[in-house]
């Protein structure tokens, strides 16, 4: 089949809260981007059909190839989302949507592929020096959950992405304050993972824990109705509530610890890349936050980490971009 006949391609980036859809009408050219709330649809197929109906006027040909990046492990045909109610069979969904091929990959596999094609203005560097070209790149990002993956560029230029579930590693507190936060979380959950703190709901959890700290019982606090990640972040940046600023500082410190742990584990001298929608919302603050200092506070490995650049991904739809690149690789090489 001529390459032009494989377009348009149906792309999706499905997280715990939102599902983003787009149509790739030519290489790296994505149109008709829509964001739908997962909770508004009973199933993935329902959401896709609704999306396609909205794009009907601009859809000259029905897509026959699709690539969906989903925020959950892919371990066969049956897929169960980690942070929302959707479950689906890949093959049944393919048939339902009358696709010739439906590729389903982990969302952070897509993020890794997207990073391979990013330009300098798509990224904001936070410290470090320069990436080593063929060294591993660590990709992680807080959102509804916490994703982690690895990108390796081989000497021949080919790419290898290693998916993982590093967001669910056990959280390791760094100091007495983080021990207090961990203890609060431990009273609520059997397993306290990094994702419990490094996510949207994690900001709320950190805030709740800090509000119980001795000496902070009587400080001005948000009402229960105001206790959302967005309001906590806004109040922290505006200086409205000191406890909100402490919450955001603690969040960034914890992220620095985890990013350093991942970088050390992988030897990620190709750089660390922070994806997801949370960090770009306060990028100016993040540049001077405790993140980088904590990232480099690893005793004998401090000098090793000091040279590793950390990049915040600023591009709006990297999940869709990566889903498209993964599908292109599959169609060309029969593998991703």
Curated annotation (Swiss-Prot):
GO molecular function, one term: glucokinase activity
First-tier enzyme category under EC: transferase
Catalyzed reactions per annotation: D-glucose + ATP = D-glucose 6-phosphate + ADP + H(+)
GO biological processes: glycolytic process
GO cellular component terms attached to this protein's record: cytosol
Protein keywords: ATP-binding, Cytoplasm, Glycolysis, Kinase, Nucleotide-binding, Transferase
HAMAP family assigned to the protein according to its UniProt record, in alphabetical order: Glucokinase (MF_00524)
Protein name: Glucokinase
